[in-house]
A protein has these predicted regions:
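Axial heme c-ligation environment in periplasmic c-type cytochrome domains
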Residues: 42-44, 65-94
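Gly/Gly-Pro-rich "capping" loops immediately C-terminal to redox-active cysteine motifs
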Residues: 36-64
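Bacterial N-terminal signal peptides
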Residues: 4-13
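Short sequence/structural segments immediately N-terminal
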Residues: 24-28
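The canonical Cys-X-X-Cys-His
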Residues: 30-37, 90
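Sec/Tat signal peptide C-region and signal peptidase I cleavage site
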Residues: 15-20
Length: 96
């Protein structure tokens, strides 16, 4: 029985995924420099008209743009410790 418990715990810990960071905290730390209006081409938080054509490209494309850099967007969006899940959460938060 002890082996089953140990094996179960080991399997569960291998499959754990790092929880996404707080989107607002990531925005304030990394994204807000450009997305608060200082950079005219960067869509501002909550600007539905600016976000709509970007969201139409799909989340995977937007995450790729953040990760690799796109136009004036620096690679990794200045968040060096963000995961793809973090980027998805921040994109979702910013676009609302």
């Amino acid at each position: 029985m002890k082996e089953v418990v140990v094996l179960t715990f080991a399997l569960l810990s291998m499959g754990s995924v790092q929880a996404a960071q707080d989107p607002e905290a990531v925005f304030n730390r990394s994204c807000g420099m450009c997305h608060n209006g200082q950079l005219p081409t960067a869509p501002k938080k909550g600007d539905a008209a600016a976000w709509q054509p970007r969201l139409a490209q799909g989340t995977d494309t937007l995450v790729k743009h953040v990760t690799e850099g796109f136009n004036a967007m620096p690679a990794r969006g200045l968040c060096m410790d963000c995961t793809a899940e973090d980027y998805k959460a921040v994109i979702d938060w910013m676009s609302k």
